[in-house]
Amino acid sequence: MNWLYSKTLGSIGSCCIDTLPWPFHSFFQRNLLALPGEPGNPLESSATESGKQSRSCLSASPVMEEEGCEHSLQKNPTRQLPLDPGQELTKDLKEKKLTPKRLQLLLVGKTGSGKSATGNSILGRQVFESKISARPVTMAFQKGSRELEGKELEVIDTPDILSPQNQPEATAKKICDILASPGPHAVLLVIQVGRYTTEDQEAARCLQEIFGNGILAYTILVFTRKEELAEGSLEEYIKENNNKTLDALDVACERRHCGFNNRAQGDEQEAQLQKLMEEIESILWENEGHCYTMELPNVSSKTL
């Protein structure tokens, strides 16, 4: 009878296991196909043994902590298998503490792109001076902060640091002296819809000269005057505006972009903030919650 039970269950189990993502193969082959009363059956294993099994199936992930993994699987060792184990694994990983409680966001862009107005939209109040002017309005670094989704957002508005007239090395040192530790977790490169000009291209180039090519892994393209797109989507605008340079920049930033109507209120304002936070969470996840750092010439490695 035991032979028949084992044979039938083994055939069914093997078929199911073949459809699972790789981290679960060894776990289920070793434990869930065991007969009742045999060693290795998880329903008869102790909590300690369950913890050991969890480490073996997830130890390949560099962002998982052994203690956290063990704790999460001990809560319900007899829980039913999810319909999509891979999805639950991703959820468990993302629930790890990769998001700092305090996030520093750096606003950059050419003069007139709407940096200050975007900063005010993120903060939910008027903090930075914002007006239409042919000359730069923001003449110095300014900071504002707010609580959002249980996190403290520190938004830093910048003067015209991406001007081609500036010396990249001198600008980088000045930024390091002014910005507080731990440094920016995301850089918001502000671009006005419908006006991706040569100056915008120069601003993107200067951004990389100042911070290094690695900065694009922390950069989100923020398009202001989103309302001018009317019924069209931002994705369509980027891909169909016949501007290969803009599309290439978006690709370099891994398609992280969002649109802002800086006159929006209520639900529209909340929706665009939510989209921005999703892009920020994406950066934090990909970089394991670390802020951006760079090497300065003739200076030891310094955190921006």
Swiss-Prot record:
Organism from which the protein derives: Rattus norvegicus (Rat)
SUPFAM superfamilies: P-loop containing nucleoside triphosphate hydrolases (SSF52540)
One of the GO biological process terms: lipid metabolic process
Residue segments, region G1: 109-116
Places the protein is found: Cytoplasm, Cytosol
Region (Disordered), start-end ranges: 39-86
Tree of life domain: Eukaryota
InterPro entries: G_AIG1 (IPR006703), GIMA/IAN/Toc (IPR045058), P-loop_NTPase (IPR027417)
AIG1-type G domain boundaries: 100-301
Region annotated G2, chain positions: 136-140
Record keyword Cytoplasm present: yes
Stretches with biased composition (Polar residues): 43-59
Binding sites annotated in the UniProt record for GTP: G109, K110, T111, G112, S113, G114, K115, S116, A117, S130, R225, K226, E227, N262
Family, similarity comment: Belongs to the TRAFAC class TrmE-Era-EngA-EngB-Septin-like GTPase superfamily. AIG1/Toc34/Toc159-like paraseptin GTPase family. IAN subfamily.
Protein name stated in the entry: GTPase IMAP family member 6
Gene name of this polypeptide: Gimap6
